[in-house]
Design a protein with these regions (language model features):
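Aromatic-rich, lipid-facing transmembrane alpha helices and their immediate juxtamembrane interface loops
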Residues: 1-158
């Protein structure tokens, strides 16, 4: 007697593929950034890396509907607005500016900043959903602290 195919098996295999792509590209990027002679070349690849990670998340997301697109759009628009206020009016985060690492800028703010914010917020949200923290408040606080820590770590590169 034949066993019916497991419809989840294909989903599990593609999730493993997406996770493998994320791990591989992050390890290669980290290695390139840590080797002084390769650092300038790898910094030029940062926008492409962010776009690749965006593609991986979009392709792996289970339900792309109006709510998801609204979520993405709000992050893109909101993050650009917040960064514009920070860079041009020195509000919220103090006095700072972006270098060329994140690529093309519109009014001193990299256009890809929305992708970066989306990746960070989405990934942190997934991590907090899968965490063992029972309290929603603790997940929100932990997620916010994690985002601040990540920002402190990646800010020098941007």
């Amino acid at each position: 007697m034949m066993t019916p195919p497991n419809p989840l098996k294909g989903e599990l295999n593609s999730n493993k593929l997406f996770i493998s792509i994320i791990i591989l590209f992050h390890l290669v990027g980290l290695t390139g950034l840590l080797i002084p002679s390769l650092r300038p070349q790898f910094l030029q690849l940062v926008p492409y890396h962010l776009l690749l990670m965006l593609a991986v998340i979009i392709f792996s997301h289970q339900n792309i509907d109006g709510r998801f697109l609204l979520f993405v759009g709000c992050i893109f628009i909101g993050s650009y607005a917040v960064e514009w206020l920070g860079v041009n009016k020195h509000l919220l985060f103090g006095h700072y500016q972006y270098g060329q690492t994140l690529g093309f800028q519109l009014d001193n703010v990299p256009l890809i900043i929305g992708v970066n914010w989306f990746l960070l917020i989405y990934s942190t949200g997934v991590l907090m959903q899968r965490s063992r923290l029972k309290s929603m408040l603790m997940r929100v606080i932990s997620g916010a602290l994690l985002l601040v820590l990540l920002d402190v770590l990646i800010e020098p590169v941007a």
